[in-house]
């Protein structure tokens, strides 16, 4: 019978001296004086009758002693010896070590292969395995299988023969350094054994010892090493040692069970809670200072043999399978959701962390560990489906996430619409008073210009004079005196700061700074003044002898018999200057008539009507054809900006968003950040799906309106590409600090403005019209069915769109937050459109493409047909129509013409139908947006320690009153000195700028307070980069807040105007902890 098929015991041993030296003596035919001690062992299943049925569980009498028990010829021993002697048993002896090459990382390596046959040998083996008795080296020598043993060592011996030059010199090459291939082949075929090893050991003892010590690198491990690595309990010492060293396959090529590290194995055995008898050796873990005691302790343990030992292996394999199954369930959900859950990158990162947290938070882990704990002594462990970890996570989290993958379920489960119904009469009056006059945005025929357009400073003086004239007749102050931007960020319901404290903060900000202006003037900026004027009903005086105009709005416009509301525009002038306009009547035809299809193009457009609108590809190519026809017909478009506001008004115009009015047109600012250029056919196909997603969402959100996604219009405008080297002035990055700083001051002085439209200078589209016109003007659409073969769009990094969707009658929206939420819902609706993801998805860098920052009071958005202004005064990046014709469009030319109607691309246009507004959508509730952030916040509230309030943290430091004066005094006296010290250490030479600094309170909220630092010298310099040239000094702020660890912290941040510093983006420089004593420590 083949020896490899015999019953086998794998045995890990140790010696008191050097195990390598003693082993080499045995391998070379000598007898060592040092006995061998069994540390751990395992057996093949055909020896279960020996080790399981006669294990420690069958022993009923336990006699604790600190010496080995006398082994007598009792029934137990006779029974075991009978079972042993009925067969030959292979015993393979191991030492810690082995090769580490490729994917194989051995933990133990065999050194002896023995075959036990006689009763004397079995008796010695029985004493060693059952009671830890020393194993005499004579037994190893007598039972050693020479052939099998030296098969283990053949490679080592051959290598040693080569390295020690133990070869015939004729086999060497001429230089005596390299061995020929023929010699190596001869050497490999040569059988090596004890004779060769003995010769090597006799002549090269040092080299042989070194080689074997490198192979069996654990030869010097002490008993303490085993205790530290596998202890400290008896269960882990015995079971973990056996599993980790003898029962784990460490070859990654053949690995089926995941390879866990030692600590993980020890942790897994903690839930294997089978009752065990006391160790009959009488030793404790602390007594195991020698290998004889370690061997007695391990071999006498209940965990060494019997059902406890046999079931341990089955349990650990099932436990690993159960754990990995639950983990893989989460991975599978994430992998599947990765394909279908199209969300912005930040939300997807939150989703990944939340998915794991929902499965592996403390409660879930505790329940899982309880479910997989095994304490049955008799039955084989069965852990399959014992844990519901993945199921609970699915019910609590993944099902909710999956609801975001279906538009109907997404809106039904995540969106709550707060709608107020108006009566017919009230609705009619509400529509008239809260929308622009119809003629203001009507472009059917030429009309003269009636309005005012001038620089901000001029308009400010004009408004002040008008207020002085009308104030005796009841004209009230235009805007409440909150700090600029405070009304947009403060949550009054959550705020714990009193109104008196806010007024004190406002009063504290009236102190002039070095520029002559107050740090944060409480008077409203020009944008809010104009928005208030244009929307307010105001008063009217009929005493013409006293005043020339009846209302302040008439006085502002300089024309009688005009009524509001009126649109307010921002106009970007060359060199960064700004102008504003309030218009009662305009010559829109002079703007839009430039963008009409020529007569020849009209005939071609008529031919395009024959295309089947249900053919998605053909319809997309038809839309591309119409867009190209328009692009080739545009003429006489000025590319030179003007310094005269009224002239520049027809080159650059941005509508200011007015929260005092209702929204009748949904204007979306869309920016696709792309990986590579998109073919125009693909782009048109993707935008058809974009349109369908928006209108489908509106159909669900407005149940009492008639919305037909296949028929209702949706107007697209695409930004033309400027020259690659052009730098755009009105770079519309939204500032982080707009709501905490005096932005209006910078607007009026032309130093800063945030329009929040396109975020980069590399605007979009506009390919070479000379090339495309020749190729596509008379193209046969039916012959070009491959959208990927169309010409690519020339934009390299970003594609910008303005998408205008009329709110269906009889609905209207109110409020900035409502519109922001609505835009977020529509973005999710677009991402749920399969065609959009299929066509556009592969080209997108991320899935956050609708900018909601434009929907803030006083922010502006560039209108279609207008351009941006560059630093050189050039007008670039026009917003031109990008046609997406509805499937059921009856008159294509009428649809094309409607793109030029200003009533379709203003936020607050009056509905063109006679149906008054009856339903006002004023709030969107539910978890339609920021679901992951809200989930994180709830989990943090449940599992994190209670968060102390800012008020409590300040009271611990002696600040009992939360008013601006007290907070400023606290910062000036306690914090600024330490900030200066920190700057002196980390920013040498800059501390002089902060020596005469004082703080000004800007905003007080429930959980943070913001201050601006006022420099008493020439001003601050940027702490991030050493900018060249005379640049406006950056603004420096400090914020006071409590972090997640309940530490009161102060953060210093700067807002630098340099492009290298992201053009006014707020950047935190450092954060310090505020302890209960004056000196701060770095956080």
Swiss-Prot record:
- Zinc finger regions (CHC2-type), where? 1022-1061
One GO term under biological process is: DNA replication
Annotated Gene Ontology cellular components are: host cell nucleus
Where, per UniProt, does this protein localize? Host nucleus
For this UniProt entry, the molecular function terms from Gene Ontology, in alphabetical order, are:
DNA-directed RNA polymerase activity; zinc ion binding
Q: What is its main location?
A: host cell
Which UniProt keyword terms apply here?
A: DNA replication, Host nucleus, Metal-binding, Transferase, Zinc, Zinc-finger
Q: Where is this site: Essential for primase activity?
A: 669, 671
Q: Which domain of life is it from?
A: Viruses
Q: Name one Pfam family in it.
A: Herpes_UL52
Q: EC number(s) on record?
A: 2.7.7.-
Q: Which InterPro entries match?
A: HSV_PRIM
Complexes and interactors: Associates with the helicase and the primase-associated factor to form the helicase-primase factor.
Per the entry, what this protein does is: Essential component of the helicase/primase complex. Unwinds the DNA at the replication forks and generates single-stranded DNA for both leading and lagging strand synthesis. The primase initiates primer synthesis and thereby produces large amount of short RNA primers on the lagging strand that the polymerase elongates using dNTPs.
Q: Which family does it belong to?
A: Belongs to the herpesviridae DNA primase family.
Protein name in UniProt? DNA primase
């Amino acid at each position: 019978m083949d020896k490899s098929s015999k019953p086998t015991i794998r045995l890990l041993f140790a010696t008191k001296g050097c195990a390598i030296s003693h082993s080499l003596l045995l391998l070379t035919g000598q007898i060592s004086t040092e006995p061998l001690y069994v540390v751990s062992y395992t057996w093949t299943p055909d020896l279960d009758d020996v080790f399981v049925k006669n294990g420690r569980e069958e022993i009923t009498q336990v006699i604790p002693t600190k010496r080995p028990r006398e082994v007598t010829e009792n029934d137990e021993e006779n029974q075991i010896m009978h079972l042993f002697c009925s067969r030959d048993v292979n015993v393979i002896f191991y030492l810690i070590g082995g090769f580490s090459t490729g994917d194989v990382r051995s933990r133990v390596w065999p050194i002896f292969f023995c075959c036990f046959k006689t009763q004397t040998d079995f008796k010695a083996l029985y004493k060693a395995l059952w009671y830890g008795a020393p194993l005499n080296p004579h037994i190893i020598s007598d039972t050693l299988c020479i052939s099998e043993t030296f098969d283990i060592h053949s490679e080592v011996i051959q290598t040693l023969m080569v390295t020690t030059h133990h070869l015939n010199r004729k086999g060497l090459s001429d230089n005596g350094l390299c061995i020929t291939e023929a010699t190596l082949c001869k050497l490999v075929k040569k059988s090596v054994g004890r004779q060769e090893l003995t010769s090597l050991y006799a002549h090269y003892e040092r080299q042989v010892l070194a080689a074997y010590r490198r192979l069996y690198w654990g030869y010097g491990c002490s008993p303490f090493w085993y205790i530290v690595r596998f202890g400290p309990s008896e269960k882990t010492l015995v079971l973990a040692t056996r599993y980790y060293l003898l029962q784990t396959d460490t070859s990654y090529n053949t690995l089926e069970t995941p390879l866990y590290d030692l600590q993980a194995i020890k942790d897994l055995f903690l839930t294997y809670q089978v009752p065990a008898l006391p160790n009959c050796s009488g030793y404790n873990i602390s007594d195991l200072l020698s290998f004889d005691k370690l061997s007695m302790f391990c071999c006498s343990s209940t965990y060494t043999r019997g059902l406890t030992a046999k079931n341990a292996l089955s349990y650990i394999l099932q436990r690993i399978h159960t754990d990995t199954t639950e983990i893989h369930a989460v991975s599978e959900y994430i992998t599947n959701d990765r394909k279908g859950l199209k969300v912005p990158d930040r939300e997807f990162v939150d989703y990944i962390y939340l998915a794991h947290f929902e499965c592996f938070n403390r409660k879930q882990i505790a329940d899982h560990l309880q479910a997989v704990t095994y304490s049955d002594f008799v039955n084989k462990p069965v852990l399959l489906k014992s844990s519901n970890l993945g199921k609970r996570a699915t019910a609590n989290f993944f099902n909710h996430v999956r609801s975001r993958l279906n538009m109907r379920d997404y809106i039904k489960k995540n969106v709550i619409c707060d709608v107020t119904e108006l009566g017919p009469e009230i609705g009619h009056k509400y529509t008239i008073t809260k929308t622009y006059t119809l003629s203001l945005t009507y472009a059917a025929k030429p009309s003269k210009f009636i309005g005012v357009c001038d620089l901000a400073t001029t308009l400010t003086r004009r408004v002040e004079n008008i207020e002085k004239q009308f104030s005796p007749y009841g004209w009230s102050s235009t805007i409440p005196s909150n700090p600029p931007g405070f009304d947009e960020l403060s949550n009054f319901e959550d705020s714990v700061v009193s109104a008196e404290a806010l007024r004190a903060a406002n009063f504290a900000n009236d102190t002039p700074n070095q520029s002559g202006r107050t740090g944060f003037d409480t008077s409203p900026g020009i944008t809010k003044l104009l928005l208030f004027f244009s929307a307010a009903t105001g008063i009217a005086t009929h005493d013409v002898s006293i005043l020339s105009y009846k209302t302040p709005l008439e006085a502002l416009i300089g024309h009688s018999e005009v009524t509001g509301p009126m649109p307010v525009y921002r106009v970007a002038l060359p060199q960064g200057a700004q102008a504003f306009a309030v218009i009662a009547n305009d010559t829109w035809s002079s703007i839009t008539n430039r963008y009409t299809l020529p007569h020849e193009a009209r005939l071609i457009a008529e031919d395009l009507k024959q295309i089947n609108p249900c053919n998605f590809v053909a319809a997309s190519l038809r839309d591309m054809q119409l867009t190209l026809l328009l692009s080739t017909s545009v003429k006489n478009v000025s590319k030179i900006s003007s310094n005269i506001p009224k002239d520049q008004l027809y080159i650059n115009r941005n509508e200011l968003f007015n929260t005092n009015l209702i929204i009748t047109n949904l204007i979306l600012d869309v920016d696709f950040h792309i990986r590579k250029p998109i073919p125009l056919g693909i782009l048109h196909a993707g935008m058809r799906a974009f349109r369908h997603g928006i209108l489908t969402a509106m159909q669900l959100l407005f149940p009492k309106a008639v919305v037909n996604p296949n028929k209702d219009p949706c107007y697209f405008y695409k930004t033309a590409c400027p020259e690659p080297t052009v730098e755009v002035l009105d770079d519309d990055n939204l500032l982080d600090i707009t709501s905490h700083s005096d932005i209006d001051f910078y607007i009026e002085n032309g130093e800063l403005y945030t329009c929040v439209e396109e975020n980069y200078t590399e605007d979009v589209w506009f390919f070479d019209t000379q090339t495309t016109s020749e190729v596509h003007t008379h193209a046969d659409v039916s012959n070009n069915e491959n959208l990927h073969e169309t010409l690519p769009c020339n934009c390299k990094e970003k594609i910008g769109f303005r998408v205008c969707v009329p709110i269906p009658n009889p609905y209207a929206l109110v409020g900035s937050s409502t519109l922001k939420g609505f835009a977020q819902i529509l973005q999710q609706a677009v991402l749920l459109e399969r065609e959009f993801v299929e066509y556009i998805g592969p080209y997108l860098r991320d899935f956050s493409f609708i900018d909601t920052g434009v929907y803030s009071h006083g922010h502006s958005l560039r209108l279609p047909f207008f351009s941006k202004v560059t630093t050189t005064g050039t007008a670039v990046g026009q917003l031109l129509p990008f046609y997406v014709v509805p499937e059921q469009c009856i008159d294509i030319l009428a649809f094309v013409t409607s793109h030029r109607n200003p009533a379709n691309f203003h936020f607050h246009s009056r509905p063109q139908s006679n149906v008054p507004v009856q339903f006002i959508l004023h709030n969107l509730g539910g978890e339609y947006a920021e679901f992951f952030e809200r989930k994180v916040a709830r989990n943090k509230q449940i599992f994190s320690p209670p968060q102390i309030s800012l008020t409590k943290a300040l009271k611990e430091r002696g600040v009992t009153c939360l008013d601006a004066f007290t907070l400023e005094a606290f910062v000036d006296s306690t914090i600024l000195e330490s900030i200066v010290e920190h700057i002196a250490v980390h920013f040498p030479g800059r501390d002089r700028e902060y020596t005469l600094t004082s703080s000004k309170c800007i905003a007080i909220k429930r959980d943070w307070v913001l201050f601006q630092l006022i420099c008493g010298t020439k001003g601050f310099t940027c702490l991030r980069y050493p900018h060249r040239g005379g640049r406006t000094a950056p603004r420096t702020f400090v914020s006071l807040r409590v972090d997640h660890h309940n530490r009161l912290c102060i953060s210093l941040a700067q807002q630098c105007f340099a492009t290298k510093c992201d053009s006014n983006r707020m950047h935190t420089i450092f954060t310090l902890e505020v302890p209960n004593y004056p000196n701060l420590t770095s956080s």
